[in-house]
C-alpha cells in the first residue's frame, strides 16, 4: 500500500520538477569531468574537472539538506533516511572524452533538449541517472517517506579508468545490505564477466634492413575500451609496393617514396563486443600472414597475432574458451598494436564468466607468453560479479519492473563493467530499456526523458519495498 501511494506521488513530483532536474543535470554536464592527472592535487586525485564535479554535487546536497561526505576526492556519498542498515545506489561522475566534436550534432558539454531527448556527454553514462537518484532522495525527503533503512548514493570519480574510487571507498566504509548501479540496462543485469586488461610485448635486440619486406612502424590508439578500429603501418623493402597494394581494396595506401603508408579503418565498437564488427587487426594479419621475406621481428608479431588472436573473438586460440549457461561465453579483443624500431606491444582485454578462474587465465597467458618469447603485463583485473535470481533484491526489482512496464523482468549477464561488481550483494539495474539506443561513449550521447521518469518510478518502488 505504501509503495503504491508513494509511487504515484513520486510520478507527480517528478512531472512538476522535471525542469529543475534538467537544470541540475545541465550544470553537471557542463563540467567536462574527464580524468586528467596533470591537474591532480591532494584532494583531487583524478584531476581538476572531476573535483569540480564533486564540488557541484556537494553544493547540491547542502542546498537540499541531504547528508554528504567527501572521501578525499576519490568518492562522495549523499544520503537520506535513518537506520543501521543501508541501501546503496552506485554512480560515477567521470566521463569519457567527447572525441571529435565535429561528429556531434550538439555541443557535447552543453546539454541540449530536442523534443523528449537530451544530448550531451554523460547524460546517460552516468550523470543523468546520478541526478535522478539524487532527486529520489530529494522527493523522499520532501514527501516525508518513512524510511527505516538509510538510502545512500555513492559517487565515484574513476569508473571509466582505474576504479581506485570504489576501492578506496569500500576500504574505509562497510558494504550496504543491498545495492545496485543504475549504469547498465533493464531488466536486471545479475552477472558481469570478469575482465583482464593486459598486454604482450617484445623488445628487439637487432633490426633487419635487408629483408624483402619490413614493417617499419605500426601505430594505433591505445584505447582499451574499444576494438582496434584504426591501424597505420609503414612498409619498406623491395616487395613493399606489392604488399601495400594488397591492402588497397579496403585501406588507404600512400606512396611516401622511401616507404608505403597503409591506413586501415574499421567501425568502432566497444571491446566487450568484438564479434559485432570487423577490426583492423584482423585485416592486417589476413594479408601479412601470407607475405614471404618479411623481416624476422615483424614476422614474430604477425605470427603471435595469427596464432593467438586473429579471427577469434572467444579465446579458442588462447586455450581459454569457456561458456557458462547463465553468463555466456568468453570474449577476447585486441584493442591496440604499436611497433617501432625498438619493439612491439599489443593491448588486449579478456572477459570471462563463472566457471573459469582468474588463476587459470593468468597461468595460461603466462605460459603462452613464455613460449612465444614475449613479456606478459597485467594492467587491471576486475573480478566478475554474479547474484542469484532467487535473491531478495532481484525479486523486489523484478516485481517493480513488471509493475511499471507490464513485462517480465528477465535476468541476464554482460561483459560490461559497472560498480555493481564492487558490491557483495548488488547488480546493475537500468536505466536503459530494451531496444533503446543511447550512443554511450560515442558522439551524440542521448537520454530519453520518458524513460528516465519510468526508471525513477521503478527505483522508487524497489527502494520502498526493500524497507520492509
Language model features with spans:
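Acidic/His- and Gly-rich active-site-bordering loop/insert found
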Residues: 2-119, 143-147
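Generic non-transmembrane alpha-helical segments
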Residues: 13, 17-20, 24-31, 56, ...
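Acidic, glycine-rich active-site loops and adjacent beta-strand->loop/helix elements
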Residues: 93-95, 151-162, 182-187, 222, ...
Amino acid at each position: 500500500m505504501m509503495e503504491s501511494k508513494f509511487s504515484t506521488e513520486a510520478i507527480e513530483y517528478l512531472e512538476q520538477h522535471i525542469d529543475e532536474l534538467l537544470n541540475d543535470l545541465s550544470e553537471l554536464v557542463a563540467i567536462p569531468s574527464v580524468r586528467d592527472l596533470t591537474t591532480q592535487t591532494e584532494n583531487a586525485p583524478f584531476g581538476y574537472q572531476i573535483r569540480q564535479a564533486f564540488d557541484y554535487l556537494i553544493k547540491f546536497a547542502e542546498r537540499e539538506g541531504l547528508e554528504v561526505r567527501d572521501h578525499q576526492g576519490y568518492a562522495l556519498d549523499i544520503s537520506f533516511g535513518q537506520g543501521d542498515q543501508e541501501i546503496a545506489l552506485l554512480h560515477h561522475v567521470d566521463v569519457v572524452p567527447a572525441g571529435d566534436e565535429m561528429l556531434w550534432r550538439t555541443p557535447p558539454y552543453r546539454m541540449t533538449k530536442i523534443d523528449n531527448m537530451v544530448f550531451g556527454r554523460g547524460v546517460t553514462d552516468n550523470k543523468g541517472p546520478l541526478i535522478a537518484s539524487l532527486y529520489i532522495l530529494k522527493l523522499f525527503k520532501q514527501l516525508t517517506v518513512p524510511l527505516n533503512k538509510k538510502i545512500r548514493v555513492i559517487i565515484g570519480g574513476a569508473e571509466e579508468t582505474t576504479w581506485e574510487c570504489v576501492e578506496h571507498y569500500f576500504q574505509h566504509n562497510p558494504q550496504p545490505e543491498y545495492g545496485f548501479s543504475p549504469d547498465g540496462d533493464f531488466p536486471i543485469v545479475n552477472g558481469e564477466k570478469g575482465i583482464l586488461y593486459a598486454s604482450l610485448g617484445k623488445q628487439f635486440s637487432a633490426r633487419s634492413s635487408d629483408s624483402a619486406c619490413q614493417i617499419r612502424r605500426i601505430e594505433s590508439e591505445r584505447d582499451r575500451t574499444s576494438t582496434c578500429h584504426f591501424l597505420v603501418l609503414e612498409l619498406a623493402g623491395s616487395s613493399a609496393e606489392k604488399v601495400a597494394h594488397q591492402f588497397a581494396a579496403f585501406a588507404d595506401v600512400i606512396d611516401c617514396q622511401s616507404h608505403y603508408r597503409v591506413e586501415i579503418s574499421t567501425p568502432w565498437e566497444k571491446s566487450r563486443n568484438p564479434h559485432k564488427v570487423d577490426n583492423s587487426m584482423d585485416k592486417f594479419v589476413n594479408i601479412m600472414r601470407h607475405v614471404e621475406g618479411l623481416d624476422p621481428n615483424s614476422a614474430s608479431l604477425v605470427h603471435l597475432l595469427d596464432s593467438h588472436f586473429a579471427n577469434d573473438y572467444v579465446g579458442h586460440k588462447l586455450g581459454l574458451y569457456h561458456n557458462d549457461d547463465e553468463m555466456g561465453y568468453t570474449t577476447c579483443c585486441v584493442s591496440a598494436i604499436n611497433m617501432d624500431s625498438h619493439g612491439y606491444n599489443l593491448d588486449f582485454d579478456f572477459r570471462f564468466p563463472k566457471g573459469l578462474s582468474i588463476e587459470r587465465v593468468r597461468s595460461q597467458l603466462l605460459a603462452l607468453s613464455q613460449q612465444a618469447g614475449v613479456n606478459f603485463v597485467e594492467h587491471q583485473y576486475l573480478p566478475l560479479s554474479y547474484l542469484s535470481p532467487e535473491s531478495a533484491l532481484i525479486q523486489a526489482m523484478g516485481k517493480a519492473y513488471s509493475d511499471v512496464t507490464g513485462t517480465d523482468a528477465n535476468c541476464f549477464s554482460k561483459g560490461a563493467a559497472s560498480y555493481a561488481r564492487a558490491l557483495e550483494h548488488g547488480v546493475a539495474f537500468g536505466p536503459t530499456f530494451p531496444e533503446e539506443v543511447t550512443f554511450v561513449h560515442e558522439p551524440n550521447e542521448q537520454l530519453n526523458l520518458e524513460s528516465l521518469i519510468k526508471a525513477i518510478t521503478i527505483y522508487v518502488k524497489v527502494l520502498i519495498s526493500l524497507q520492509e
